[in-house]
Every structure is written in C-alpha cells, then in structure tokens.
Amino acid sequence: MRKYAECAAIKLDSFGDWTAFVLTERGRPDIAPTVKHLPHKAARLLHHLRQRGASVPLCTSPWDRDRIHRATLRGSHQSAKADIDFVCQEMLEFCEQGFWTVLPLSIALRLPHLRLSPLGVVPQRNRRPRLIVDYTYSGVNDDTVKLAPPEAMQFGKALQRLLSRIVRANPRYGPVYLGKIDIADGFYRIGLQPRDIPRLGVILPTTQGEPLVALPLALPMGWVESPPYFTSVTETACDLLNARLRHWQEVPPHPLEDLAATPPTAVASPPGKWMPDTPAFGDSAPLHSPPLAYGDVYVDDFIMAAQTRRHRRRVLRAALHSIDQVIRPLAADDRPSRKDPVSVKKLRQGDAFWATQKTILGWDLDTRAGTLTLPPHRLSRLYELLDAFPATRKRAPLAEWYQLLGELRSMAAALPGARGLFSTLQDVLKRKANSRVRLSRRVFDSLTDFRAIADSLRNRPTRFRELIPVGDPIAVGACDASQRGMGGVWFAAGLPPLVWRSEFPPAIQRSLVTSDNRTGTISISDLELAGTIAHKDVLAHALPCVAERPIWLAGDNRASLAWATKGSATSTTARAYLLRLNALHQRRFRYVPQHDYIAGKANVMADDASRRWDLSDAALLTHFNSSYPQDSLWTLQPLPNAMRSAVIGSLSRQRSIPASLRIDTTPLPVPGGSGNGSAPPSASARICTTSRATTFPFSCSSRNGTDPAPLPLATSPFDLARWRTPSVTWRRRSPGWGPRTLA
C-alpha cells in the first residue's frame, strides 16, 4: 500500500493537476453515455452525474492544519486497526479498480478543503468484511448540504410493494415466481466531482512511517448522500424495467440470460409446516387481470416477480436491458478490473433463478404457502441477542441497546405480535445516564415475550395477508370511551348491527386524569386505546373468522389511533401494557386492522354506547332502534369476560393476558386452505365501505372558503364510510420520479 501511495504521488506530480489525475485514475464513467436521451424525468440528473460527478458541498469552513493533525492522531476505528492487512489488501484492490486513490499525508495536505474521517471494518455473513467510513464522527455528514434527490430512495417500502403484488396476483396463472439481480460494485459506479474529493478523505491505519490518506474517486460507503445519488440510478433503471412491461414491448435476448438460469447450489426447503394445499389468494385479484410481471429494487438489489414462463422471460430480459441503459455494459477497451454492471458471481450462485421459495431482502418468502419467515441465521441471531441480556444483568451500554432495538425492529415483520413489545424497550432510552441504560423487570418481561414468540416461529410463520390488506373490510365500526365506560358499534355482512359496552370499575374511574384529579395515572387516551382493543375483540368473537381479512374502525381520539396503528409508544404506563395486549390479540386472530379518525360530534353511536349508563341494556337497544334504525334490529353483543379482565389489568399495569392469547407453538389454521379453517367471506358478502366524502368536508357555499360545513352524524355504515381513508396498493413512484435539484 505504501509503495502504491508513493507511485500515486509521483503520478500526481507529473500531471500537475488534481482533476486530470482523478479522471485518469477513475477511467471512463460507468453511467451509460446515452442516459440523457432516456424517457425519464431523471435523465438530466444522470447525465450531470456522468459528466461532472456528485458534488460534496459543505456548510462549514475548511479545516485548519490543527484539526487535520488531531484527526490524524485519532486515526481509524479499532475494527480497522485490528485488521490492517485486510484493509490494505482491500484498499489496494479498490485503487486498481479506480474507486480510490491513496497518497502520503504530506502530499494530501496540498489539496484544498482536505478533511479526514476514520475508517471502520464491518463484518458480513458469508462474505468478506466491508470497509465503511465514519463520516458522522468527523462531522462531514452533518455539514453536508443535501442536494441529492431524496425522493429517489423508494426502497423503504420495497417489501410491502412486493407482497402487495403477490397477494393480488391472479391465481388463474399459477404461483408467483421470484428472482434477484445484484449490481456489482454498487456505490462505486457513481463518480465524485474531483474538486470535492478531498472533503471525503480517510485516514488509513498504519503501523509505521508517514500516515496514508485514502481519497474516494466514487461514492463512498458511509457518506450521507451516497444512497440517494446511487438510487437515482437504480430506481431509474427499475422505472424503465416496469415501463417495458407495462407497454408490452418486445424485449430481445440478453447475453447474460443463459447464465441467469443457473439453479442455486442448494434448493431452499419449505419454511414451515403451516402450508395449505392451494394458495389462499382466491379473491384477491379480478379474474380479468393479466399475469403478474413486476420489478422493484432495494438500493442495488433488483427484485423480479412473474407468473407464467413467458412473463418470467420478459421480466428477466427487461431487467437486464434496463440496467444496461443506465450503467454501461463491459466494453473491449475497459480496464481488466472492471466488472459487468450485473453481478456475474451472484448469477452463478442462482440468485436470478426463478423459484417460489426465495430469500428476498433478508426474508424467506414462500409464494405458494403465502408465508414470510426469518432465515435460520437471522433466527439464530435473534436468540443471540436475547441471550446477551440475562435477567441478572442490570445495565447495558447505550450503543448495545440501540443495536438490540434496531435488529429487533428489523425482524418484527416476521414476528407476529412483536410490534406491541417495544414500548418498554424504547422507554429505557429516556432514562439513560453516562451512555448506559438501566434494565428493569419490565424490560426483561418484554424480552421474555420476544423469546416466546421466537420459540413459536416454526409453527407460526407470518402470512402475507397478515401484513397486506386485500379487498374491502369485512366489517366497519366505531368505538369510544369515557370515564364511566367504553363501547362501540359494528356492521358486518351476515350479522345484525351490533352494539356493545362495558363499564369501568370504580378504581379505574378514580385513576383518570381530569381537571379535578391531576394526580391520576390513566389518561383519557389510555381509556380510548382500551376501548379500541375491546372493540376488536367483540368482532373477533361475533364473526366465525376474521383471519387475514381487513376490518375498519373509527375513533375520535387521535393519540390512541396513532398508538394502535404504530403498535408502540415510548412509555411504561398503562398504554404500554395495552399495546402489548393489542399486539397479542392481533397475533391470535390475525385480522388486518385499519384505523381512521372520526370527529367527536359525528361519532354519536359510539358516544351513546360508552356514555348512556342511565339506560339499562334493554333501554339502550330501544334507544338505538329508534334513534339509529337499520335494516335489522340492533343486537347487544357482550364483551367477553376474559378480555374485560385483561383490559382492566392492563390499565392497572398488570401483565394479565387471557389464556387464548398466550403465545404457544400450536399451528393455526389457514383460511381458504384444505379444510383447516373457515373460508373468508366472499366478495358478494362484503358490506358497502365506499368513501363518499372527504374526511373533513368544506362547504362550497359558505361565505368563507375555510369554514367547515356542518358535520353529518354517523348513524349508519354508509355514514361511517365517509370517514374511511381508501386503502390503495403500495406502488412505486412510476412512471418516473423527478429530482427537485440538478446536483
């Protein structure tokens, strides 16, 4: 490495110009020369990146020699110092490929705007470690003026978009097949503007001699603007891919097409025993819809989904050609170290081979069974995380706690019921001291719940339709809570209109925070959240099957709706216990809840159910039949005693859970499977849930255009549907997103 740095210094002196030196070392741009002619809004940005590179504007003054000296003395992270041989070997390969260059510190100091950040080494599973720069520690990330288009980063919902396409695929054309294509060398495909490169300098670990400085010639790992700049390229390619598929363009063969058909060395086994004989997606797509042909991308991982053999071939060809449109393929005059844009190594490993069982974005997907599970290595990692926090442990470093929360959050989608267990774990961060957190009994109770969920995963994988709402809700309702009690109404096909209510015990009523009782321990929002949970339990026991079906409910308390939707709140109060109860209830019954706000003045039916305690049960039914008449008479549905006890216990901060909701390893039946459960209601049995007005309508005839029109009272399912936010399919920003700035 030192010999290379000395040669690079000599070459720089011979050029006498930093820009000429960079362009020579980097070679031809990887972005295709024809990008400016692409039928896409981002064409101008990509052409700019090809011609000039990504800029690195900073909002602070250049570093002086003293600060550079302090950064040099500080050096790299311990992870890099502990593996100097690997760092030198890896950096030397990067220099040969034109991604980095290395200079002695004395030469690098001549470059204007030089800054030095520490280098780290991150281990990776089944791959060699990765070099990453800590630009946050040096302040470069905070000082960077954000010019890259943030709307290019669509990868946050890639999994939801893919699952949404799968569950809505037309079953007439068979199961959905999946494939992957990886971009080789990732961020290093996008060059930097030569004059800005010294701002991203890196101090390398050395054992002796003059310190060495590494300078990135392309987007480095760790810089805050690298993801949006790079995804502006890959997302454009993905848009071109889907445009080809939408317009039914004929796609010619691709040179890598045969290599992409290489089967994997090991065929994945079914992720669990819970597998129906036939797909359970029978009513999720119109019978006239064409076979699925879709592509998406997560940073540099292209995901392909298709049904028939013909469409699988079209999607594969379209993906390969679309990538070539934005990242030029290999040319005869390229340097020997340059790789094809598509990772040939991954193709040989079978990544692009079409299969119904595939590891996608760190999840094992089975499109025949319609399930999502944690791969074995991630499940082992989950146990490793939990084992690191035995009940005898009293404190933990803050960094370790953040790592635990981050990894548990990343696994929560495949852990049914896990979303409601984060409230206590997050609350620990509010009480941190001296970069350490204190671990309490409540924390270990939550970790025990996580372990119980992990133990049940073999027989309890997550169904796609537990995550993606499909079709109209099978029931609509509204609920409310007051100091005296809680109640609500439900409308569902095949059932009479239901009203329910339950009175809070005096101890709960006395604990409510009011203007006269400021020392209370329960807020009205907590009671509203309790009512929401009880409301769903009433429906779950009234209908024969709610599994994997959307249900819609409205409430007039925004805080409780937000907690129920998110699944957690940073707290150890009653709401933490309620959210745990809410998550385990959804885990048990597997419905897909949709929560919406309704104005308090319009929520009259739920108000009466929760407040009219001057009426007996019979008088309440008479009141509803006369005030809110429906096609059939109202029925008073009781709240099961087990749920009432659990709600009161949670409000009292007790971990009381009904036996039916406890985490076990018993396989659950599959709706629509081979006799293992009740079939979901047919499309013809759905109730009308079409939204006929906006959530907050304004009067067109009012003297002031901002004056709200009088809110209509919600006295029927049609009135409630006015407040429903329509559920739409997760979609990409197609046919194209456009940057707000040039670069």
Residue ranges and their predicted role:
Residues S79-A82, F86, M91-L241, L245, ...:
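Catalytic-core region of right-hand nucleic acid polymerases
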Residues A306, K536-V604:
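RNase H catalytic domain
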Residues S674-A743:
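Charge-rich, intrinsically disordered N-terminal extensions
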